[in-house]
Swiss-Prot record:
<feature type="transmembrane region" description="Helical">
    <location>
        <begin position="368"/>
        <end position="388"/>
    </location>
</feature>
<dbReference type="GO" id="GO:0008360">
    <property type="term" value="P:regulation of cell shape"/>
</dbReference>
<dbReference type="GO" id="GO:0009252">
    <property type="term" value="P:peptidoglycan biosynthetic process"/>
</dbReference>
<comment type="similarity">
    <text>Belongs to the SEDS family. FtsW subfamily.</text>
</comment>
<protein>
    <recommendedName>
        <fullName>Probable peptidoglycan glycosyltransferase FtsW</fullName>
        <ecNumber>2.4.99.28</ecNumber>
    </recommendedName>
</protein>
<dbReference type="GO" id="GO:0005886">
    <property type="term" value="C:plasma membrane"/>
</dbReference>
<keyword id="KW-0961">Cell wall biogenesis/degradation</keyword>
<feature type="transmembrane region" description="Helical">
    <location>
        <begin position="213"/>
        <end position="233"/>
    </location>
</feature>
<dbReference type="Pfam" id="PF01098">
    <property type="entry name" value="FTSW_RODA_SPOVE"/>
</dbReference>
<feature type="transmembrane region" description="Helical">
    <location>
        <begin position="108"/>
        <end position="128"/>
    </location>
</feature>
<keyword id="KW-0997">Cell inner membrane</keyword>
<keyword id="KW-0132">Cell division</keyword>
<keyword id="KW-1003">Cell membrane</keyword>
<feature type="transmembrane region" description="Helical">
    <location>
        <begin position="303"/>
        <end position="323"/>
    </location>
</feature>
<keyword id="KW-0808">Transferase</keyword>
<feature type="transmembrane region" description="Helical">
    <location>
        <begin position="337"/>
        <end position="357"/>
    </location>
</feature>
<comment type="function">
    <text>Peptidoglycan polymerase that is essential for cell division.</text>
</comment>
Length: 409
């Protein structure tokens, strides 16, 4: 009986019966188990975060959506639509050769910088920050796009100028000059959180490319001095720092959001109050379904829920770094550095988001990749995951000496 079942499971439908197109479709979704054509673990982890994010955004946004729109599922429906668009973008990215992004990296970086400049000219303000551009019914956050485009450019630059980065100071300074331009445009919005993520990602990629150690000490000292200057020049940053250090001194003013987030973490205990049973999301905690969604996770699912999210994000980052390492071992420099860049970007942004929600870091206004509410963040994060899958797919196909799907290189 078991032999018959095995034969049925291994049965292949002949192309003559269903047509060549159907056979190609079957082959696409049924790769050989011994050598899958994509990183199944990476894909599964990304889908798990998207699904978990939908559940938590639905739970966290019900009171706010009901108060603002009269429909408690308003944000949940929008988030579901964003997820569908993100999946479509991810699948479309899988069909684009990685070398196409490499060839257009300079133009993409220029486009990203132009978008950051446009925000200052035609953008509109939300919650005290001018970060959004509106084109008809569509609004997008230029900073999210700039992060991805900068990673793509850095990967291209390092793949072409790796020796120059290692041996000459100018090879190290060139990308930092571009980073400085992007940072100035971001600080004018202001968006200090994206500056932190972009700077840390760029410096980490230069380190992995083999830049000299003394150069990093110089960058570190410069960044510390610049940070001190920014805190002194902008009063609101000083206020955020003081609030972060002693939020209980102004629990109903500047320290209100952090205090409510800490209360949520405290009420969650080990296993949480149960899904949907958060008290802090009932108009107490601002931005409960966006930047502070981890506070709701902590309250409803407890320490175990927070640990599960952190573990999933870390595994996704680990897969990205593994892809990068394997690409470099096969002399695929661009794909390797891009995978490294995306992995570092995700890890830093997740670290900052969780650190802010738990009171370990000052407020920055960054989303949790693939989890928090927000169409821009979701779509760009999904596109980045699609790039990782495509890079790994090409690496595997190169190992099998077969031309990659999705177009000629």
């Amino acid at each position: 009986m078991s032999t018959v079942r095995e034969e049925q499971l291994n049965l292949e439908i002949p192309a003559s019966d269903v047509g060549s197109r159907w056979q190609k479709l079957i082959n696409w979704f049924q790769p050989k188990a011994s050598q899958p054509l994509y990183d199944r673990m990476l894909f599964t982890l990304a889908m798990a975060l998207l699904a978990f994010g939908f559940v938590m955004v639905t739970s966290a946004s019900l009171p706010t959506a009901d108060r603002l729109t009269g429909n408690p599922f308003h944000f949940a429906i929008r988030h579901g639509i964003y997820i569908l668009i993100s999946l479509a973008v991810m699948l479309a990215t899988l069909r684009v050769p990685a070398n196409s992004w490499n060839q257009q990296s300079g133009k993409l970086l220029l486009l990203g910088l132009i978008m950051l400049l446009m925000v200052l000219v035609v953008g509109y303000e939300v919650n005290g920050a001018q970060r959004w551009i509106k084109v008809g019914p569509i609004t997008f956050q230029a900073a999210e796009v700039a992060k991805l485009f900068f990673c793509i450019y850095m990967a291209s630059y390092l793949s072409r100028r790796e020796d120059e980065v290692r041996e000459a100071t100018k090879g190290f300074i060139k990308p930092l000059a571009l980073l400085f331009i992007a940072a100035v445009l971001l600080l004018m919005q202001p968006d200090f959180g994206t500056v932190v993520v972009l700077s840390a990602t760029t410096v980490a990629m230069l380190f992995l490319a083999g830049a000299r150690l003394w150069q990093f000490f110089a960058v570190f000292i410069t960044c510390v001095l610049a940070l001190i200057l920014l805190i002194i020049v902008e009063p609101y940053r000083m206020q955020r720092l003081l609030t972060f250090l002693e939020p209980e001194k102004d629990p109903f003013g500047a320290g209100y959001q952090l205090m409510q987030s800490l209360i949520a973490f405290g009420q969650g205990h080990f296993s949480g109050a149960g899904l949907g049973n958060s008290i802090q999301k009932l108009q107490y905690l601002p931005e409960a379904h966006t930047d502070f969604i981890m506070a709701v996770v902590a309250e409803e699912l407890g320490f175990l829920g927070v640990l599960a999210v952190i573990a999933t994000v870390l595994m996704l980052v680990w897969r990205a770094l593994i892809i990068g390492r394997r690409c470099l071992m096969q002399e695929q420099r661009y794909g390797g550095y891009l995978a490294y860049g995306i992995g570092i970007w995700f890890s830093i942004q997740a670290f900052v988001n969780i650190g802010v929600a738990s009171g370990a870091l000052p407020t920055k206004g960054l989303t949790l990749p693939l989890v928090s509410y927000g169409g821009n963040s979701l779509i760009i994060s999904a596109l980045a995951v699609g790039l990782l899958l495509r890079i790994d797919h090409e690496r595997r196909m190169l190992g099998r000496k077969v031309a990659p799907r999705g177009g000629a290189e």
